[in-house]
Swiss-Prot record:
GO cellular component, one term: cytoplasm
Pathway: Amino-acid degradation; D-alanine degradation; NH(3) and pyruvate from D-alanine: step 1/1
Domain of life: Bacteria
Enzyme class, spelled out: oxidoreductase
Name of the protein this chain belongs to: D-amino acid dehydrogenase
EC code(s) of this entry: 1.4.99.-
GO MF term list: D-amino-acid dehydrogenase activity
Reaction catalyzed: a D-alpha-amino acid + A + H2O = a 2-oxocarboxylate + AH2 + NH4(+)
Organism, scientific name: Brucella abortus (strain 2308)
Function recorded in the entry: Oxidative deamination of D-amino acids.
Membership in a protein family: Belongs to the DadA oxidoreductase family.
Amino acid sequence: MQITILGSGVIGVTTAYYLAKLGHEVTVIDREEGPALETSFANAGQVSPGYASPWAAPGIPLKAAKWLFQKHAPLILRLTTDPVQYRWLLQMLANCTDSRYKINKTRMVRVAEYSRDCLIELRKDTGIEYDQRSQGTLQLFREQYQLDGIGKDIEVLRQDGVPFEVLDRDGCVNVEPALAHAKDKFVGGLRLPNDETGDCFKFTNALAKIAEGLGVKFRFGVNIKSLLMSGGKISGVETSEGIVTAERYVVALGSYTPALIKALGLNAPIYPVKGYSITAPIVDESRAPVSTVLDESYKIAITRLGDRIRVGGMAEVSGFTDDLPAARRATLDLSVTDLFPGGDLKAATFWSGLRPMTPDSTPIIGGTRYDNLFINAGHGTLGWTMACGSGRLLADLISGNKADIRADDLGIARYN
């Protein structure tokens, strides 16, 4: 089939790759001049299936209220006049119950674990390189109450068969030796040994080249205006370079997905939650991380990417903004300097991206009420973690193949 994919972030490119592997003629359209130049550009770099947890969780409303008054808060709420923002926040609050948390986390872990397996297989098949490491993720707790409160997460990890280790200070230093100088800064950690790290931008660009070798065509610098309808199905895509037609269409536009499909009567409650990162060259190996360390207090991930340290995190609900406030940079600097001062922060680059978040934190993967329109969006902070599995899953659904994992609860129908 002829298939057009809208969006060349990591989700769009992985979808294109898997569709091409199944023999389809694929075209990818994006307004940028190359792949992964928006939200996929400089994320935290972690592939962490076990840490696939909903932002909407029991106790979060109270925590959020406290965070609003903290200088280095992991959550920043900047209210706008947009009613969509208020509606999304209310939907998120409705998911902050024990029952919804368990349902949403199980869905997320299912996709994330499958995706990690798909990534490993893809790596074996292609030999793709992207500063990859397979040395686990360490969630670091600065306070005892944080360590004492991981019971629910451990219960879900056990249920889903995800290996984990609860570590004391010495155990944390054993897996991340650079923490030896900061033993007074934390009390323990939770380690998931099967997690990975890697540069999402490098991966997406390398996979795009592999996909081109499979026949995928990329059209960059093309603005997407609207989806056209005829006879109850999508008949084309109106772009800045004319109308593009295909047999099937995939919308993988992250936070911009709702605006495109709204005219079709489809509701995708995806809202941009802004994240920040800095990337610094390593100047002292003895003070640099081995893999990814999650600073639980600040909700910040510190990741080793080759000869660089990537520090990413925070969640700012402020709409479609692209500013880079010095206060956000200060929080990133504080966390990494406290734990891993092996990077040259004076030479660091500062970046922000708009994570496409659903109120239940679960991505939208699947078809719509229009037979030839599909969506792969809303992965939030886990686009890199879930990319390969999401792309392969949707490729199977479009092709009419039996999916490897359950997919009936991942579609847009749960909102419409």
